[in-house]
Amino acid sequence: MGVSKIESTQASTYIDDIHDKVTRASNVIVPLSPISVFAARSPWARLEHKSFDEIAHWLKETRKVDMYPARMTILEANQKGEIDDAYVEQFFQQWLNDTALKIPRENAAQYGRNALKLETLETPTDIKSQLEALVSDLNEQVKFESENTVPLKSTYILDEKNERLIDTVDYHTIKWCKLYIDDAQSGWTMPNRDKGLFYAWRRLVAYDPALTKDQRARLKSLPNEAEDLMQQALSYLNISEADAQTYLENHLLSLPGWAGMMLWQDEHNHKVHDLLFSYLAIRIAMEWAIVEPYLPVSQPEDLNDMNKEELIASWIQWGNFSMQSWKALSIEAQQAHIQFAYRFNEQFCRKLWLDAWEATYNQQLKAMIGPKSSVEAEQQSQTLVQMAFCIDVRSEPFRKHIEANGPFETIGIAGFFGLPIEKAELGKKYSHPSLPVMNQPQHKIKEYTHEHEPNAFQQRKHALESVTYTFKKMKQNVLPSLLLPELSGPWLSLQMFTRSFIPKSVGSVIRKFYTSWLKKPNDTALTLNYEPQHQHNHRHIHLEDDLPVGFTDEEKVNYALQALKLMDLTDDFAPLVVMCGHGSQSANNPYAASLDCGACGGAASGFNAKVLAQLCNLPEVRQGLLQEGVAIPETTIFAAAEHQTSIDTLTWIYVPKLTEAARNAYENIEAAMPKISYQANKKRLSQLPNNNLTNRNPNHEVYRLTNDWSEIRPEWGLAKNAAFIIGQRELTKQSDLAGRAFLHNYNWKNDENGTILENIIAGPALVAQWINLQYYASTVAPHYYGSGSKTTQSVTAGIGVMQGNASDLLTGLPWQSVMSADNKMYHSPIRLVVVIQAPQAFISRLLENDETFKQKVMHGWVRLASVDEDNHWHEWSNEVKKFS
């Protein structure tokens, strides 16, 4: 693409409130956490003040990123019966009725119906010359308005090799980010790293051999302070104050992964300050230094120009116009028809198809859920075990198998169990926030042993860490690295052979090693009681913050009461109540954290389950609960377990002394668990692409998959998630939800003021929405919001993955998490529908009180339906507008 010269513009331009503009610009990205604590986030979480469709249009215009499902994805879903054609016609007619048309309705209807077939537009070669002449005449007589954008200078300036200079800017940006962010992976760290990114870059860039002498000189001429440097570079690039924020946004959107990591560091690492500002200052300075020889330039006039030839051709193909009938239209009519086609483009067609897809799923879900049989009440009174599972969609089919195999009741609640804690596990160097990422921990709970001297577990743990540390240091140093292959070669070769050909056996050996040689002491305990800071020294836990350790007596009762109310368990207690966290097992999987509990910030949630179970067993807590109207029988015992989602087993992590009734219940669930696991694994294996695995023993096969380091898909994770159902279990117990629904228990009759519902919406429902939109984004725009194929990923700097050595830090899910084969989707990219079992008055009150949730529904980021007290289904997408 050529560029045209304009007059020199290196006059000084000062942009007011540049820090505020950077802060506002950062809303176009989201923080990207290190992959070891991968937590699902909606890539559009900070843009929900605008509608889904507005952001889709904006991204298409500015980044060429499509937020709607692809044409082939829609056609495949339609063929599979996931989209009802009647809804497509319904939404099209509704749009025609609501739109002020400037062309005859019959023309619009005919064009629209043909365009909605999503057929490829083909322009006959014999009319191309006539189209060119028509467009030439139109351009002389009519001025068509196009989008007003502020693209980066480097996106439309080409170098001598006819390559865009933005690629060079990205290359240098990535290089400096990798050097700075490096998480103790390299033996020789970036000089001056401890003084901040900008300071280190400023000292080193003058010696960068990848830059030309002139480029280094230009950078050296810029000011030494980040703000002054950014101001000067923007001035040299001729960016006005009015365009500054948009220009900053485009820089952030060029590499949203690396920018997101800088933003995450700003928000979570107290050792850094203004890291995102430094990132932008460096990037803009690099851009100016690279494009300066080509300045001054003007933006090409055709950058955002509509393709009028194609639009006229679309009327000939889909509007059944001939060239003669088109020419017979007046200039004004031609302009109106072109504008209609420009608006009713393929992206808009796919938007209507998405609406129809979601409406079809709503209708299917409506038909599945409803009142249950009268036998339910009798079964409830005979329940032996009540098991509270995370709302995770993988829990739903597992819960169904449990309920079918005995007098067992299951309950849904977010996996952090309402506990705002940071956990410090025995043997771990660092603590981890074990709650949704949008919340901050209020307490630290530590796991410790009663022994005051270092015990065998600690010694063995340190010994293993020493071996790993020594191996790493030998790799990083020049002389020892020459000797390392001779020493480690035979052992690593043996490991490679065994893990490749007998993964299940090797995995079994490794598990036995960790469960025996590295088994935690039996006397481990949790710091549930509040402790002053000076008592922490003997715990052998590194503290990174000043959070209070443990709970006060009042807090213990409050958190236990809150959790029991959230799961609607305040009476009719079974002899055994089990809090079930969940985690996942897989080998050689950088995305292992994405398979753990999203409500615990990308970590297994068994720790939270154990904390709550122990709280509920404390006599003083039960006494406090009794004063609040919750009477737990003396025969009821709380225990904790962890659901391993990749092998569908239940691992007990806390079983106190049991009463006779609780012991009987425990033995019943233990006896049923092998059959439950077998059934659950068989069902889950049948859904994997290589479904001939079900011909083998399911339990053996899942262990092989989780231990095979070449396995790209040990489980489907949360793929196909589509609904968040808030209501009693009776609403869904007899329904086959196909592992697509988050299930949270709720009884509106016990929530007179609506506080419980508001808490569910503000916490668990938000987590579910973020998970849903991350899967959605990774499916519809895998090149931008996904992370490519697992087989070609490389873990970078210990904090994320890249494709190759010069890509963005990838933000989303790998291809194997959402697709079952090339060009064949597995995840259905539809937006989450929240279904609430409550009277309409409850929903109205929720929308009036919760402005954030109302905005999500109104702007199309989440859908809302309800089931009232008479089991009638209500859609709220249009009703919500009444509350604005």
From Swiss-Prot:
Keyword terms of this UniProt record: Cell membrane, Membrane, Metal-binding, Transport, Zinc
Subcellular location(s) per record: Cell membrane
Binding-site residues, Zn(2+): C390, D392, H582, C597
MF GO annotations: zinc ion binding
Assembly, per entry: Forms a complex with DabB.
Function field: Part of an energy-coupled inorganic carbon pump.
UniProt name for this protein: Probable inorganic carbon transporter subunit DabA
Lineage: Bacteria, Bacillati, Bacillota, Bacilli, Bacillales
